């Protein structure tokens, strides 16, 4: 199934990293480190702030998942492209499609050939989540349980 049959495909609209003061909104760029976030900014009036769940694809073709508000880099040839679901999706499903994009299409984009809405919208994402042979749900639930237990234990230690 084509990406534009699963997601609304939009170009980011913002300025360069240096144009922003410190704030509370994650600024997402081309880095693969820290889920693409390079700093937290105060958006400018003409910026397009997105609200997740959404997938942000960097100009270099790396997909990251964002569940809350975020500001993707949107100027020049290395702008981000944002995929917002056309229908309600679980976080597992969003994560699945981001990983599928990275495995299937990440190789297509480089410094010489940046990603953009035109290049992304007609790419295929197959198999779709409902036909996937993977069951990430139980693994993610197990990991969440382990982390929750560790966090609660640490919280109790800090109370002492």
Question: Where are the predicted features?
Answer:
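A short glycine-rich beta-alpha junction/loop motif
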Residues: 73-81, 111-135
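A short, aromatic/hydrophobic, helix- or strand-capping loop or linear motif
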Residues: 17, 110-111
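Structural beta-strand/beta-sheet cores of well-ordered domains, especially the beta-sheet scaffolds
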Residues: 23-28, 53-55, 79-81, 121
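A short beta-sheet element
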Residues: 40-99
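Short, structured motif recognition centered on aromatic/hydrophobic residues
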Residues: 1-7, 28, 80, 94-103
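Extended, Lys/Arg-rich, non-catalytic nucleic-acid recognition/anchoring regions
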Residues: 107
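Non-catalytic DNA-recognition/assembly elements of restriction-modification systems
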Residues: 1-13, 17-35, 130-160
């Amino acid at each position: 199934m084509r990406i534009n049959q699963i997601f609304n495909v939009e170009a980011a609209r913002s300025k360069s990293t240096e144009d922003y003061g410190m704030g509370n909104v994650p600024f997402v760029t081309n880095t693969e480190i820290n889920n693409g976030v390079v700093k937290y900014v105060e958006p400018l009036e003409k910026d397009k702030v997105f609200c997740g769940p959404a997938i942000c694809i960097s100009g270099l073709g790396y997909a990251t998942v964002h569940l809350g508000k975020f500001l993707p880099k949107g100027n020049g040839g290395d702008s981000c492209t944002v995929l917002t679901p056309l229908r309600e999706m679980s976080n597992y499903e969003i994560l699945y499609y981001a990983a599928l994009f990275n495995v299937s299409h990440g190789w297509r984009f480089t410094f010489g050939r940046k990603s953009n809405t035109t290049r992304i919208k007609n790419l295929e994402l197959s198999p779709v989540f409902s036909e996937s042979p993977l069951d990430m749900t139980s693994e993610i639930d197990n990991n969440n349980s382990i982390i929750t237990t560790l966090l609660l234990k640490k919280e109790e230690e800090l109370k002492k």
